[in-house]
Amino acid sequence: MLEILLVFLGGGLGSIARYLMGQLMTIHFPNILSLGTFTVNIIGSFIIGLVISLINKNQWNPQIGLLLATGFCGGFTTFSSFSYENTAYLKNNDYLLSFGYTIMSLFWGFAATFLGIYLVKRG
């Protein structure tokens, strides 16, 4: 039961953080549709790299992984918004923007995850 509560709490906090980040990006960059989603996905990728690496090194309790990786990152990051935004770009015939957004999201997502892992290994 504790595991479910940890995922629930982390997911709720992650969802709130995603909402607030989206609002912040909309205020400061109103003409860039996907910046909020891009930002949370990259930050979430970095966090999950750190958290899982710290757990794998036995520096953190695996229950922290349920709270932060499964819960928070699960609520914070969003593949569905990424997919929707790409669909909107394609409907507007913005093929280059859709392609660029996809490539940049994948590249920076992997880079952020690897950076988190690297920082823990370097430790």
Swiss-Prot record:
The protein's GO terms of the molecular function aspect are: fluoride channel activity; metal ion binding
Membrane-spanning residues? 1-21, 32-52, 64-84, 99-119
Which reactions is this enzyme annotated as catalysing? fluoride(in) = fluoride(out)
Q: Which UniProt keywords apply?
A: Cell inner membrane, Cell membrane, Ion channel, Ion transport, Membrane, Metal-binding, Sodium, Transmembrane, Transmembrane helix, Transport
Record's bilayer topology term: Multi-pass membrane protein
> What single Pfam family name could you report for this chain, choosing any that match?
CRCB
* Main location group: membrane
Q: Name one GO biological process term.
A: cellular detoxification of fluoride
Regulation of activity is described as:
Na(+) is not transported, but it plays an essential structural role and its presence is essential for fluoride channel function.
Instruction: Report one GO cellular component.
Output: plasma membrane
Q: Where in the cell is it found?
A: Cell inner membrane
The positions making up the signal sequence are: none
Does the UniProt entry include the keyword Oxidoreductase?
Answer: no
For binding Na(+), which residues are annotated in this chain's numbering?
74, 77
Residues in coiled coil? none
Q: Per the similarity annotation, which family is this?
A: Belongs to the fluoride channel Fluc/FEX (TC 1.A.43) family.
Function, as annotated, reads: Fluoride-specific ion channel. Important for reducing fluoride concentration in the cell, thus reducing its toxicity.
NCBIfam families noted in UniProt: crcB
Q: What is this protein called?
A: Fluoride-specific ion channel FluC
Q: Which organism is it from?
A: Gloeothece citriformis (strain PCC 7424) (Cyanothece sp. (strain PCC 7424))
